[in-house]
Amino acid sequence: MEKPKQKLTQVTVNFFLKTSQMILQARSLDEHGKGKLNKWFNLHTFNSDDLRSELRLWRSTIDLTAVPPMIVETYLDLGNLPQGHTLALKDEHGNLWPVTKGGSKKTEVVLERWLVEFDPNEFGTIEELPYIYKQAIILCRSIYTIIRIMPAASLRNQSPHYVLANKIVDGSKPISSKGRIGLSKTIIPHQMLTDTHVRHRTFSPIETSLGTLKVSVAYRSHCEFTELAEWDHRELGREKEPREDLRQVESKGEEDHSIESIPYEEKAYKTDEEKSDKTPEHVQYKPFKPEFKQLEAVKLEGSDFKSELHEGTSPLSLSGSPSSPPRDDKKRPSIQPFRVGSIGNSPPPASSSLERRISITSNKSTSNASLAAVLRNPRSSFSIPIAGSIGTGAPVTGGFPRSVSSSHGYGYEDSDSAANTPRFSSSFGSRASRRFSNTSVRHGSLHDTTSPLGTSAGSATSIPLSGLYIDDDISDFVRMIDSKQDLRFGHDSGGSGSQSGSQYEVLNRFHQLKSQHQQLGDSVNASVMMHRKSSSPPGSYESHVPSIHSRLRESSEPHPAPATAPAPGPLIKPASKMMSSPVISTTSAHAMSQTASATTRDEIVGLATTPSTYRKHLHYENVFDDDDEDEDHHGYFKAKARSKSLSRSHFDDDDDLLFTMSDTNLAKH
């Protein structure tokens, strides 16, 4: 029983010696030195005579329970560093941090600390010696490989002024850090580290019946040391006025100029016993590169936006970039501030055969051109004054509602927003909710109440429950507008004076249309009560479509309304499928109602938008079914004829006067 223990003790002691020899030969000793060849654990090393005295404590071990831990330290010996030279450490970002200078009291920098120990308190059940020996072979080969890829391996024979050295000490005694920078002392500040400055590695232990053999190592993660000559006189001066140097670099505008400065503080190199918390500051100048600006083709007037390129720098580095040169004050090409469906930028369509209609409460024969002027107005600048306006000598600024909403009422924008730009909101929601859209409240507002165009859009803020209804497909309507050559503005690339003059002439020409349509403008401004027929003639057909409710003068009515008490009149119920324009909801049968004779007329007192004027709830039909135009016409009139006998039981709805705007109507004006 004693013999197996002696053999196990012999294997353990030789493992201690083999580990120390592998570390020293990889760091400080000559790997091909002279001495007796050691073939333990199938790994050839040399028994150096210099290590005989240092390893005497472990060579003379008889009892494994009393074997002390072995610590093998690898340190950087700075005893030969010249006076005035400084040793600096480079981090992963390329920044240099001062370690010590030649002639100081700190002459050693600990890089690695290996620990080999035998713990008798932890033991296993394996007693087979060959198995333990094979495990020791694997462990020695692992150490032999790891030790050559650690950070300190690159410092071997790097400089004659600082060399690698090793020290074997008893791990059971405290280790003094006097005159050296210990392993726990960080050189790079913690806030600059992406990882800890010390890393630990533990190898797989070997369990025996007497105890456990353990090997571990702690080492610095940064070991890229650099020697700086005459640093105190050449480099330290740059720390005093870093901002002045930075301004000089910016003024010169050099493409590649890098200054790295490492301040030095003597107080940062106290011993571990003094527990100094101070760390040297670091000032670095990154290479200067001229700032690259991308060419902006379009820029809004008054915009303060300035794009800048930022280079990633270290947290404590002082990096400067030159101020960007002032921009040229050249005229930028103007853009149209439409968010969806810009009228000014829409390409003309191949053909204009499709008929476009709009439903706005106004006189049919006098409102087409004014409405077209309203829709053309956003294509010009909103700040161009129009001289020679009708009825006043002062220039009038053209205005347009901030939001032209669809049947859902979305797209409302606050009037206090930064840009006074109109936008056409699209409604892609449920079709069922559109049926009740003509009772929705529209919040669009006109900032200029003296609009020279004189359309019913000017009453959007004065009449409750009023608004401009535009269907989803705004792009089709835009293409129809652009197809008319007389409606398109010229986008000349000439000077600013000719472009503004051209826009001024076009706006002034369409502004003169107010004299031809003064009746519609007066009706909007006067906001008189609207009268309508209480019953439809047998040959007339009306549809339930959204419209803008405005009050017209009594004189504008083709038939004066008798002063009778309000009474419900028969209503012809339209078919379930009705014609819907891709751009604006309208009806094609309203033109027939102007010439048909009326048999019974009743008067509805009050605004057409007031729900109290109707005795029963309104009945709305779905007008947004997108079917073929020809099929809608035939199905519409056939359904009207079939439902004629049943429509007498329904009351009037809140539809106002409708008019039809087609391509032919626009061409006349």
Swiss-Prot record:
Check the record and name the Gene3D superfamilies matching this protein. 6.10.140.1900, HORMA domain (3.30.900.10)
Q: Where in the cell is it found?
A: Cytoplasm; Preautophagosomal structure
Comp. bias regions, Pro residues: 559-571
Q: Which UniProt keywords apply?
A: Autophagy, Cytoplasm, Protein transport, Transport
Q: Kindly report the protein's main subcellular placement as a broad class.
A: cytoplasm
Q: What does this protein do?
A: Activates the ATG1 kinase in a nutritional condition dependent manner through the TOR pathway, leading to autophagy. Also involved in cytoplasm to vacuole transport (Cvt) and more specifically in Cvt vesicle formation. Seems to play a role in the switching machinery regulating the conversion between the Cvt pathway and autophagy. Finally, ATG13 is also required for glycogen storage during stationary phase.
The protein's name in its UniProt record: Autophagy-related protein 13
Source species of the chain? Meyerozyma guilliermondii (strain ATCC 6260 / CBS 566 / DSM 6381 / JCM 1539 / NBRC 10279 / NRRL Y-324)
Gene (UniProt)? ATG13
